[in-house]
Amino acid sequence: MKIFRLLSLLLVVLLASCLNKKKSADTGIPGNESRYVVLAYVTSWGVSTPETSCLTHINYAFGHVADDNKGIRIDNEPRLQMIVGLKKEKPSLKVLLSVGGWGSSRFSEMAANDSTRTAFAADCRRVIDKFGLDGIDIDWEYPGSGTAGISFSSADKENFTLLMR
């Protein structure tokens, strides 16, 4: 009989936890029904489309610093357009382009002087407008370190700060 009571109590607790609870919108992000940011990285080389019902953000991987250090080169632009198109299904979804990633080169050279930083920032704005993005994620791994086999400088940390301004 004790086991029956315990199982009944457990069943009641489980059922109560499944009740539809009102979601809080305290992230400060307009249109976000969740109190959390639920982000997925979607790759340029992938073929699947993420289920957006549980997501608040998608980071598209990847864009790279252009060869001339003055802009962005995007992997698989048609796929990026398709991912941005998911906002039609869920208008509150935010889509960002992640620029960089492991082994991404040219950040150090681009951030080293004001003219290339300014040109890069202007191109970020152009890319946001062209694709209807909600932002750019700078994924420089790692300023001041050649860990990923990329070029680096002792001034990278300071230059990264200047780039973010």
Model-derived regions, located:
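Parallel beta-helix/beta-solenoid
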Residues: D129-G135
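C-terminal motif of bacterial Sec signal peptides marking the signal peptidase cleavage site
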Residues: L15-S17
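Bacterial signal peptide processing site
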Residues: L19-K21
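Mobile, glycine-rich extracellular loop/lid and propeptide segments
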Residues: I136-P143
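Glycan-recognition patch characteristic of GH18 chitinases/ENGases
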Residues: D26-D129, G144-G146, F152-M164
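Sec-dependent signal peptide recognition
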Residues: K2-V12
